[in-house]
Amino acid sequence: MFFICNVGPFRSWKESKIFWKMEDGSPNDIQLILVTATDSSLPSGNSNQDKFCKFGFVCLSTSFERGVESDNGRDWNFCLIIISSWAVLPVPGGPVMYSESDLCSEIAFAKKFITCSYSAVLAGNAPSLLFKLTSSDDFCKSAFVLKKIDCEPNCSFSGDDSGVTSVNCNFFLFKGRGGVAGASSNRFLLIRLVGVIGIADMNVYGTIDENSAAQCSEYSKIVLPENIPLLYK
């Protein structure tokens, strides 16, 4: 079991499990537990972030298009469960330049170690056609920003009116802004989307804003017991 910290409180939450399938095919059930955290517990520099960021969690506001508006045009809110790995180590004296081809090679390496399968049961009408990230200025501005990279296909969802929706795996890239001390960061955090949980009536912070430099008072982090093995390094 490990603990996933959320960027903010939920008004409603239904307990869910995500099933990890290791390379040898053996399933590992991992129970998700959501808690809140503030930036007072964020490391002030990069010294602890290797352990700090091995796993992560971020919430987005998403909207689905079905050809016609349903549920008064309301957006569905989802939480993306991710597994992360540092793609670039810091280099003293300047930022690290890491090409897209290098990142894609890193992704290809990571894909050898884990596959995923997850289905989310949604309340009400099931979104079915198109998944897109919306733009919002009120996104919780954490120490990292999320950026899509081109060496993996877009997230795709499938579902029907029964309320069951599946999601394919994908990769994203976090570029570090530094810790709460404000130090510049020259690391990239590579994360893999491994599942989606549908949550109704969630307090929404908005979606990814790559251009914002603001810090946030609440953010996402993971607390791992020492005996949990890393899936890849």
Curated annotation (Swiss-Prot):
Domain of life: Eukaryota
GO cellular component: membrane
Entry membrane topology: Multi-pass membrane protein
Subcellular location: Membrane
Parts of the chain that traverse the membrane: 78-98, 113-133, 188-208
UniProt keyword list: Membrane, Transmembrane, Transmembrane helix
More info: Partially overlaps CDC6.
Name this protein carries in UniProt: Putative uncharacterized protein YJL195C
Organism: Saccharomyces cerevisiae (strain ATCC 204508 / S288c)
